[in-house]
Amino acid sequence: TLQAEGSTDDYARLVELLASYPNVFESEELRSIYRYAQNFCIRIINAGVSDFKSHLLSLYQYQIDQRLFLVDGHFPANDFKNIITLGLRLENFEWVEQFMEQFHDSLSPDQHENVYNYGLAQYYFATKAYARAIRVLRNVRFTDR
């Protein structure tokens, strides 16, 4: 349904179908379909339609609720960071804080501390707790992973 130049109507229909038939696909297929929907939202957001940020967060929230993000029992670091960034841009501070607390232990052990501290620093910065943000950022090692 989502082609390179897909329409918002196609997107809405896809989301409607996914909600109506949640058990039709295996987890891996469902993850791929949601990734296409996410990418569509991101393209629309990048084209200047900021209303789609809330659509994207809804997609993320559904996948979180269904545990679709977990790969081999771990939450991918990039998805974790993207979800935090989007939630903060939408000023959904309480939800972001709950998300981080609930899922930070699901990050892979080799990335757990770094990714969690980076998200926490973002959260503190967004909530204007600048001293806390700086304190937490001191514990972040930046890599290009």
Where do the protein language model's features map onto the residues?
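Alpha-solenoid helical repeat scaffolds
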Residues: I45-G48, L68-K81, T85-E97, H112
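Residue-level signature for tetratricopeptide repeat
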Residues: A4, R43-N46, T85-R89, G119, ...
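"A position-specific structural signal for the A-helix of alpha-solenoid helical repeats
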Residues: R35-F40, N78-N82, V115-A126
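Hydrophobic/aromatic interaction determinants used to assemble and anchor large protein complexes
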Residues: T1-I44, Q63-I64, D79
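Catalytic core segments in nucleotide and nucleic-acid processing enzymes
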Residues: H112-E113, Y118-R145
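Solenoid-like repeat scaffolds
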Residues: A19-L30, Q61-H74, E101-H112, L137-R145
